[in-house]
Amino acid sequence: ASLKSSGASKKEIAQCYVKRAYTKFAVDRGSSKDFFLHSYLASLRPIITDESGVVAGLQSPVDTMCVAGTKSQSERMENTLYINPKFVVDELASGVDIDSATENIIVVLLHEVLHIAYRHLIRFAHIPVNKVKLTKLVNVACDLAINHQLEKITKRSISKIGGLIPGVAKTE
């Protein structure tokens, strides 16, 4: 039986997929040339949102996945990875086997890790959140730069995975 037919909620299914992706990336690539990316991924605190994607403290709902700098209980800044379970289950894992779903999730996780590695959270923190058009433009520019690198790293066509550029659907 598949995860989707198990009767579990999308949040529980997404948790399973994300844990599997983290583990597969660590086993397959954690000790190789991708150790740099693995160390960033391991430092992220993943939080699966509810399906609405609404998170207190974030300006807009999380439709896919996103990273944000947040203060921990010890008042230390840490990077948090917010994951919408609907995106994982209905987009990344839809119509594919579990191995393909896992690879799709790894690609999106790496996309988010590269936002941190390229210091996008810090580099563009000065842009006021009320400058919506500018914020979206910067985000798309950052996404395009990241996706160009991702195709080199993963040897996969990024356009076949949805959610890596806001508002742009995957191609068939």
Protein language model features and the residues they cover:
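Short, functionally important secondary-structure microenvironments
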Residues: 1-107, 113-172
